[in-house]
Amino acid sequence: MRNAHAPVDVAMIGFGAIGAAVYRAVEHDAALRVAHVIVPEHQCDAVRGALGERVDVVSSVDALACRPQFALECAGHGALVDHVVPLLKAGTDCAVASIGALSDLALLDALSNAADAGGATLTLLSGAIGGIDALAAARQGGLDEVRYIGRKPPLGWLGTPAEAICDLRAMAAEQTIFEGSARDAAQLYPRNANVAATVALAGVGLDATRVCLIADPAVTRNVHRIVARGAFGEMSIEMSGKPLPDNPKTSALTAFSAIRALRNRASHCVI
């Protein structure tokens, strides 16, 4: 049992836009101590320079000075295999933001098996979308249908298969660029898959969740909509998310979700 007066010893995996925002938010929390940061080798010197000697900055789990009580992943899909799996096996509870990677069943099984072997808990963060608590609760009574509709400005789809479907730089009207399962959406649009995968894993699964992705010149933000029906009734939730002030490609709510996970871990009353 944790000493009620001792701060929770935390390892952060990744120190990009989300990681830096999370660190700044909890840096002075008395109940939390971000004592470790894991980043790729080529980033270690820069992160050490930013954080100073008070944080153990390393490039692997094996290099950690001691085992943390809790780990937060906000580094991208590769970090799940490289860092989260060994931490779970060692008994460290982990929260992860890179949910889109879990469309790979082998990876999801590896994480689940590692958590089981280490007696640890793996928490999937809700990230950029709300309503996940309601959807997961509704699943207990049975869900008949779950749909996710994601809209982005056309230029938000650059570098994706949408470029072969329409001219993203000269759109005058909205166009659907994908319709299918959440699993297929995650495989075709991996950089845009976290929300669809989160909705799917909370609800009816990656194959039964229907996804529609839209390039829409009328929107200036990323817009997420969940529609579900089942024994609980019906729900429809839509969110228009702002980005982090210093990174227009990163959802502010994703960072806030990670901050909440850390503070919940240190709290004795959680909602």
Curated annotation (Swiss-Prot):
What residues bind NAD(+), as annotated?
Answer: A128, N194
The UniProt record lists the keyword Aminoacyl-tRNA synthetase: no
Matching Pfam families: Asp_DH_C (PF01958), NAD_binding_3 (PF03447)
What is its pathway?
A: Cofactor biosynthesis; NAD(+) biosynthesis; iminoaspartate from L-aspartate (dehydrogenase route): step 1/1
Enzymatic class:
oxidoreductase
Task: Tell me the Gene Ontology biological-process terms attached to this UniProt entry.
Answer: NAD biosynthetic process
What EC designation does it have? 1.4.1.21
Q: Which Gene3D superfamilies does this chain map to?
A: Dihydrodipicolinate Reductase, domain 2, NAD(P)-binding Rossmann-like Domain
The organism's superkingdom is given as: Bacteria
The terms under GO molecular function for this entry are: aspartate dehydrogenase activity; NAD binding; NADP binding; oxidoreductase activity, acting on the CH-NH2 group of donors, NAD or NADP as acceptor
| InterPro entries, A to Z | Asp/hSer_DH_NAD-bd, Asp_DH, Asp_DH_prok, L-Asp_DH, NAD(P)-bd_dom_sf
Q: What does this protein do?
A: Specifically catalyzes the NAD or NADP-dependent dehydrogenation of L-aspartate to iminoaspartate.
What more the UniProt record tells us is: The iminoaspartate product is unstable in aqueous solution and can decompose to oxaloacetate and ammonia.
Q: What is this protein identified as? A: L-aspartate dehydrogenase
